Amino acid sequence: ISSEKVVPASADPADTQRMIRYEIKQIKMFKGFEKIKDVQYIYTPFDSSLCGVKLEANSQKQYLLTGQVLSDGKVFIHLCNYIEPWEDLSLVQRESLNHHYHLNCVCQITTCYTVPCTISAPNECLWTDWLLERKLYGYQAQHYVCMKHADGTCSWYQGRLPLRKEFVDI
């Protein structure tokens, strides 16, 4: 994150909302290539009450940022996205980002907030960190990967164990 600047949320002078525009140096993109090639700026609401994200600008800190590409091509992030300093990611998360996650885009992760919760399709993995630990990015997020099997179903795989034969193309 090389700089931050407070900018109007829209060109409408009656709109009093503000955004923070972070200028970034993109190191690697893991998905979304079809929507945008290179990201120079990311936007977030100015107010934390609107789920705005505060990042450290002008530091050497590197982040994993997830967000949305809006119809106007701007990349938007907020508190509900997964945003983590790269150094805080587990080894499994870093290896999976570089080698496994892109193979499993057909898998859907369903967050379990309360019981009962179930999957509704064979390509879903049930994410239980919130239910068990009351945090979204707990042990399951740090140490497991939702992976596709040869038969098209998806299930959790513990990242540091050797891959079993039933997992596809790995």
Swiss-Prot record:
Region (Involved in metalloproteinase-binding): 6-9, 48-49
BP GO annotations: negative regulation of membrane protein ectodomain proteolysis; response to cytokine; response to hormone
UniProt domain NTR: residue ranges: 1-105
CC per GO annotation: extracellular matrix; extracellular space
InterPro entries: Netrin_domain, TIMP, TIMP-like_OB-fold, TIMP_C
GO function terms (MF aspect): metalloendopeptidase inhibitor activity; protease binding
Location (main, coarse): secreted
Subcellular location: Secreted
Keyword tags: Disulfide bond, Metalloenzyme inhibitor, Metalloprotease inhibitor, Protease inhibitor, Secreted
Disulfide bridges in this chain: C107-C154, C112-C117, C125-C146
Function: Complexes with metalloproteinases (such as collagenases) and irreversibly inactivates them by binding to their catalytic zinc cofactor.
Family (UniProt): Belongs to the protease inhibitor I35 (TIMP) family.
Protein name as it appears in the record: Metalloproteinase inhibitor 4
Native organism: Oryctolagus cuniculus
